Amino acid sequence: MGSKSPEGHWQAPHASNSNELKPANPDPQTSQNGSGSADLDRGVIGDDDDDDEDAEENGVNTETPNVEKKKKRKKSNKKKKKKTKSGTLSVTELKQTSPPRVLVSTLFPSEYPVGELVPYDCTTRTTDEESRYNSRLWDDDFLPDYRQAAEIHRQVRQYAQKELIKPGATLLSIAEGIEDGVRALSGHQGLEPGDFFKAGMGFPTGLCLNHIAAHWTPNPREKDVILDKGDVLKVDFGVHVNGRIVDSAFTVAFDDKYDNLLTAVREATNTGIKHAGVDARMSDIGAAIQEVMESYEVEIDGKVFPVKAIRNITGHDILRYHIHGGKQIPFIKNNNQDKMEEGEVYAIETFGSTGRGFLDDDVGVYGYGRNENMSGANLRLSSAKSLLKTIDANFGSIVFSRRYLERLGVKNYLLGMKNLVDNGIVECYSPLVDVKGSYTAQFEHTILLHSGGKEVISRGDDY
């Protein structure tokens, strides 16, 4: 989810835009434990339980020599495990349903799939003492939580790609299908106070068509928007488990005339991932992204357009329960000398456009985010006070939409919400658009910075 810059971040919904950078997303002990930095230092290891089975298959006698074999050994009924592409093990008896409704924790009872592991080019800089320090950056639940959230994202988005995202579908049906899947696979419907904080949506599903680049979602009682075969659709949604948010996005186009646009942005995102890592500077990452993206052009209906990196929206770091931290990764050459550090989590995303490559706030509302620095102690409007209690009890710092409020049964909230926004207690986010008639695309992955390499936690077979 793209992030606005601090200069534009606390603006009112339709405040004037400046030429400053805007981040792309708004900020408002188990058997599944994993190590913080050791996975890449020592490699991901499998389960020793299969060693005896492998030995038997190779004709090696694994029985105690002094035991006389009197009966033919019965064939073991032990369920075999298969290795996933990432090298971890999973029981393969259970399969996901369509629509997805089987808990990911049921499908992977002992260990969640690991993301794409990419060692750094030079790992000699990491001493044993540094590795021990880095392993303490993350608690025991950090990797299991992140890997569970990533697997939920993969399964839900692949279902959406196959079954939901089709010409003629309403964007509301796509959004609800994605969000129902996330809640079902996480096991938390978020209907009781506090349940939303355990697992669920990391932010509202963004479904942005054509010149709308980011921050659009269906709202209640608005006219249905129908997906057309000539549209370019950006799908951006987040999944969290215990506040560990996986932020990943992709673009769908049914007409191959947009292929170069999608390829440019996908390759630019992968370039950003390639250059990301411990001690990498934001300026270097941005320059590399821009060079790759703007090497492409796309021909649409006989006219050739250069693909432009959108310059006032950025990638960002992710903090617990906060989709946006304090660091930004522009998609263009810049002077940002901030460095990435061990233990950090980043959303590496890029947006490309056939238009100006600059976004403005549009009319409408995408969602809301609680400003934790502002108290509601001086509120006078009773509806605003009541609404703020609902927000704090059910969403906290996680961005939410009007659909989420109505799902909780909240009614007649618009006046109270306006009061909260006017007092700076809640921030309202608008859709971000390029010029009409242009087309925009987005691809995004979440990465974890281990001491020995990076883990592209949201990587899948699709992108």
Swiss-Prot record:
GO BP terms, alphabetized: proteolysis
Function comment: Cotranslationally removes the N-terminal methionine from nascent proteins. The N-terminal methionine is often cleaved when the second residue in the primary sequence is small and uncharged (Met-Ala-, Cys, Gly, Pro, Ser, Thr, or Val).
SUPFAM superfamilies: Creatinase/aminopeptidase, Winged helix' DNA-binding domain
Species: Neosartorya fischeri (strain ATCC 1020 / DSM 3700 / CBS 544.65 / FGSC A1164 / JCM 1740 / NRRL 181 / WB 181) (Aspergillus fischerianus)
Enzyme class: hydrolase
CDD domains reported for this sequence: MetAP2 (cd01088)
Cofactor remark: Binds 2 divalent metal cations per subunit. Has a high-affinity and a low affinity metal-binding site. The true nature of the physiological cofactor is under debate. The enzyme is active with cobalt, zinc, manganese or divalent iron ions. Most likely, methionine aminopeptidases function as mononuclear Fe(2+)-metalloproteases under physiological conditions, and the catalytically relevant metal-binding site has been assigned to the histidine-containing high-affinity site.
Keyword presence, Hydrolase: yes
Name of the featured protein: Methionine aminopeptidase 2-2
Start-end of Polar residues biased regions: 27-36, 86-97
Residues given in the record as a divalent metal cation 1 binding sites: D236, D247, E444
Keyword line: Aminopeptidase, Cytoplasm, Hydrolase, Metal-binding, Protease
Requisite cofactors: Co(2+); Zn(2+); Mn(2+); Fe(2+)
Recorded GO MF terms: initiator methionyl aminopeptidase activity; metal ion binding; metalloaminopeptidase activity
